[in-house]
Design a protein with these regions (language model features):
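Long, terminal "pre-/pro-" and other extracytoplasmic accessory regions
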Residues: 1-110
Length: 110
């Protein structure tokens, strides 16, 4: 049986780093209601795939895209198109309007 040689680059960027990088990237391009969620490392150990979620105080509405962060350099190397993220956010916001409104009311009354 042949052994597979998998080239795994050095993991210089940890999960929390990928979230921080994605958060900064999002913050400079989209409104604050879009944020990062828990990342997943790809099978080759080269990219952190960070979900982009629509979130309001007290509620995460759902995923609207993703950002790929290099596990070796920390660079954003790929992402869902910004227009697609915004469109998905609008659609999810409309679909879950009652949930979002309830979260705001809970926050305001706290």
């Amino acid at each position: 049986m042949k052994q597979q040689n998998r080239r795994v680059k050095s993991l210089n960027v940890m999960a929390q780093d990928a979230v921080r990088i994605a958060s900064g990237w999002l913050g400079s391009r989209l409104p604050d209601r879009f944020g990062p969620a828990d990342p997943k490392l790809d099978d080759q150990g080269q990219l952190w795939w960070v979900p982009v979620v629509l979130a309001y105080p007290g509620v995460t509405v759902g995923q609207v895209g993703e950002i790929a962060v290099s596990a070796s350099s920390g660079e954003v190397v790929d992402h869902t198109n910004l227009a697609d993220i915004k469109a998905a956010g609008l659609a999810l916001g409309r679909k879950h309007r009652a949930k979002v409104r309830a979260a705001f009311l809970r926050t305001r009354n706290a």
